[in-house]
Amino acid sequence: MTETNTQKPKNRAVLVGLWAYRLEREENATEESMEELSDLLKTAGGECVGTVLQQKDAPDPRTFIGEGKVAEVRELVRAMDADMVIFDNSLSPSQQRVLGEELKVQVLDRSALILDIFAQRARTREGRLQVELAQYKYLLPRLLGMWKHLERQEGAIGTRGPGETQLESDRRHIHRKIAKLESELKEVRRVRATQRERRIKNEVPVVAIVGYTNAGKS
């Protein structure tokens, strides 16, 4: 008997952008930047299933886009069976957390998407370390969003137990990981500098192949 795989494809994303008068020009989302975001999503292996671009006077400090647009995005997520929402603009950790709670799916911004692409394409040890370090630094202030199901308990009398302990444990773990990665990066760069000095001292020629992407340099 032939089995049919009915599981939906992963990384179906609704893309959201805001153009606001009170944002700097480079901070605003435009039709062109939204198209670029869609291309980035494809590069990362995802699929754009809908876009929402809002224009308003200023970002909402809580949800970045207006409450009405949040409801519109929520309905679009449901209608298109999306499993994530990606913002073209940068979100604060608190905005990302609130939006995740409101939309009931993973919420990312352009920075997180680009870091994911870098992680996929990093080939050298130094490159992989740099991307991992950037990802941990991006994650650290957003940890509370991952533990939002414990947020009601945090700080309450009689609840300073497993939930808050785990959150602090994760923070300490990431701080240690960041310190370790920074140390490893420093060592990699030291070794590379030493090797470069040795090549120069020994007059070893350096050869570089130059050409366009996909021009057959490999």
Model-derived regions, located:
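N-terminal accessory targeting/assembly segments
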Residues: M1-R110, I114-D116
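Register-specific recognition of a single heptad position within extended alpha-helical repeats
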Residues: N28, F64, Q120, G127, ...
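Residue-level signature of catalytic and energy-coupling elements of molecular machines
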Residues: L37, V85, Y136, I174, ...
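A charged, well-structured terminal subsegment
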Residues: L133, K137-E151
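Residue-level signal for pocket-adjacent positions within structured domains
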Residues: P59-D60, A112-L113, G145, R152, ...
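Conserved G1/Walker A P-loop phosphate-binding module
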Residues: E3-N11, H149-S218
